[in-house]
């Protein structure tokens, strides 16, 4: 990736360092010493959280647009910044803010990629690596914050506001402050360029308010052009009825559960049956692979190669279909080792304990009592039904042969699916 152009230097004849007998303007006093720049400042404006729901992005989304980055570099984390203010009635909590940092930079520079930590949300693009980023962090005395922009089709979490957008006074004051910072950085020239760590996400230029206002549009256009040239579309696919039907027609073990095609629709109800899964709480059943915890869950799943190479398989003939062809079931078992040295070890145990057999704690729907034609509630007690003539029971309808769910009662219990590998 090309290095961004250096900032343009603006100098004046009366403040050139090479001129002799240089005199200062104004009050004639020496400037106040400035502290060292904060090396944990994000390149982008933050997200303000106005609700209780935590920050979460679907897989492959959540990385701000960067005109100078490649797909492999688009990975990092959002870090929550809790705020509070002292009032006359005590301490008042303010709305939290979230800031984005590239992998290996910022306050959590030493945190391994996708490690679990409170207040940290990892995001990455498809094809991104876990290598430390070359973009570093921002020097606020030199560079103004970039208004955070996302790829088209990105689902912004509900009750989150992108700072620097909209017409409120907060964003207006921030924009004017950015303009002043940019003007100061331009007048300082090359002396301030060494304060920013790493490579900038954007090409530098004269820090005017017009250039800052046009920057988000420029980033969006450059990203769309790159997507068109590579033949990729970043917009998430909208699940239609036709798509849902096609997903349902896939083989059961090849389906993928999402929010639009949840776990129950894809794989059936959770339960103890031989063809039922016993993993998943209410949130996982609802969101599937779009659950914010999915990256940690997926680390427990074996790859296709590991599954075929580590499992004990058994082929069982169950029955025949309508044409007389035999129906077989492939059962498998195995185990994996959870390494205590892994940084996600405690998170794995927490996920397993909260999701294994979680269906046993699901609330049961109460059946409403049936009412008669005159509006009276029918009672099921034997004393009230003595005078009612017993109706002959109907013969149960014949079931269609070949249905997996209808034959589950006759199947032998399958062993739990676990896998054995040395981490």
Swiss-Prot record:
Domain of life: Viruses
Domain annotation CoV N NTD: ranges: 39-164
Compartments where located: Virion; Host endoplasmic reticulum-Golgi intermediate compartment; Host Golgi apparatus
One term under GO cellular component: ribonucleoprotein complex
SUPFAM superfamilies for the chain: Coronavirus RNA-binding domain, Nucleocapsid protein dimerization domain
Short name of one Pfam family: CoV_nucleocap
Residue(s) carrying Phosphoserine: 133
Residues recorded as bearing Phosphothreonine in the entry: 405
Primary location group: virion
Region of interest (Dimerization), ranges: 251-360
Swiss-Prot/TrEMBL keywords: ADP-ribosylation, Host Golgi apparatus, Phosphoprotein, Ribonucleoprotein, RNA-binding, Transcription, Transcription regulation, Viral nucleoprotein, Virion
GO MF: RNA binding
Region named RNA-binding: 33-175
Similarity section: Belongs to the betacoronavirus nucleocapsid protein family.
Complex and partners: Homooligomer. Both monomeric and oligomeric forms interact with RNA. Interacts with protein M. Interacts with NSP3; this interaction serves to tether the genome to the newly translated replicase-transcriptase complex at a very early stage of infection.
Annotated protein name in UniProt: Nucleoprotein
Source organism (scientific name): Bat coronavirus HKU4 (BtCoV)
Gene name in the database record: N
């Amino acid at each position: 990736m090309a290095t961004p152009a250096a900032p343009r230097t603006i100098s004046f004849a009366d403040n050139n360092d090479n001129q002799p007998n240089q005199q200062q303007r104004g009050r004639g006093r020496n400037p106040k010493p400035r502290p060292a720049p904060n090396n944990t400042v994000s390149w982008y404006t933050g997200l303000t959280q106005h609700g209780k729901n935590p920050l979460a992005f679907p897989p492959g989304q959540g990385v701000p647009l960067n005109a100078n980055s490649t797909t492999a570099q688009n990975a990092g984390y959002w870090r929550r910044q809790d705020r509070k203010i002292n009032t006359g009635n005590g301490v008042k909590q303010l709305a939290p803010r979230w800031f984005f940092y590239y992998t290996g930079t910022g306050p959590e520079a030493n945190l391994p990629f996708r490690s679990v930590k409170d207040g940290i949300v990892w995001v990455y693009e498809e094809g991104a690596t876990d290598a430390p980023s070359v973009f570093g962090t921002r020097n606020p005395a030199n560079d103004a914050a970039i208004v955070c922009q996302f790829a088209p089709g990105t689902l912004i979490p509900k009750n989150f506001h992108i700072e620097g957008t909209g017409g409120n006074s907060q964003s207006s004051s921030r924009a004017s402050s950015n303009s002043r910072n940019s003007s100061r950085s331009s007048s300082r020239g090359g002396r301030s360029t060494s304060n920013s760590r790493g490579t900038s996400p954007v090409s530098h230029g004269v820090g005017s308010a017009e250039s800052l206002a046009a920057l988000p549009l420029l980033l969006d256009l450059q990203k769309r052009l790159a997507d068109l040239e590579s033949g990729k579309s970043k917009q998430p696919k909208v699940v239609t009825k036709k798509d849902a039907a096609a997903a349902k027609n896939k083989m059961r073990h090849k389906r993928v559960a999402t929010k639009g095609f949840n776990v129950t629709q894809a794989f059936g109800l959770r339960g103890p049956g031989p063809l039922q899964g016993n993993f998943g709480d209410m949130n996982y059943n609802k969101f599937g692979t779009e659950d914010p915890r999915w990256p940690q869950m997926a680390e427990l799943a074996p790859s296709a190669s590991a599954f075929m190479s580590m499992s004990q398989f058994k082929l069982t003939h169950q029955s025949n279909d309508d044409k007389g062809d035999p129906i077989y079931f492939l059962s498998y078992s195995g185990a994996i080792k959870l390494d205590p040295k892994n940084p996600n070890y405690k998170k794995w145990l927490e996920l397993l304990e909260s999701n294994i057999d979680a269906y046993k704690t699901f609330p049961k729907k109460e059946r409403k009592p049936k009412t008669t034609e005159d509006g009276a509630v029918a009672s099921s007690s034997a004393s009230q039904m003595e005078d009612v003539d017993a109706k002959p029971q109907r013969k149960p309808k014949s079931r269609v042969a070949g249905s997996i769910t209808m034959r589950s009662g006759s199947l032998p219990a399958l062993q739990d699916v676990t896998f054995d590998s040395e981490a």
